[in-house]
Amino acid sequence: MSVSQVTDASFKQEVINNNLPVLVDFWAPWCGPCRMVSPVVDEIAEEYESSIKVVKINTDDNPTIAAEYGIRSIPTLMIFKAGERVDTVIGAVPKSTLASTLNKYIS
């Protein structure tokens, strides 16, 4: 499963109402660290395709959701399970850090 883009309008359907845990990458095109973490997020999406959904949301184009979740710096990666935010990772982190965080929420 590839990474899909979500918007303010599709966030509830794609993230909150999803049965799988969802990794949400809050990013913007001008953000250097966001571009650095993007390949890591893509690799995670491939490796965990049967157990999680991975989505990206452009904070410039979708300010409502970014404000709702208090996004102050990007990249911010949030994990949602059963419609609730269960964890947050801020900044461009190594794949190992992101994987170990995700593993806590995969049953």
Curated annotation (Swiss-Prot):
Its main location: plastid. Keywords: Chloroplast, Disulfide bond, Electron transport, Plastid, Redox-active center, Transport. InterPro entries: Thioredoxin (IPR005746), Thioredoxin-like_sf (IPR036249), Thioredoxin_CS (IPR017937), Thioredoxin_domain (IPR013766). One of its GO terms (molecular function) is protein-disulfide reductase activity. Residues 2-107 form the Thioredoxin domain. Pfam families: Thioredoxin. GO terms for cellular component: chloroplast. It is found in: Plastid, Chloroplast. The active site is at 31 (nucleophile), 34 (nucleophile). Belongs to the thioredoxin family. Participates in various redox reactions through the reversible oxidation of its active center dithiol to a disulfide and catalyzes dithiol-disulfide exchange reactions. This is Thioredoxin. It comes from Pyropia yezoensis (Susabi-nori). The lineage of its organism: Eukaryota, Rhodophyta, Bangiophyceae, Bangiales, Bangiaceae.
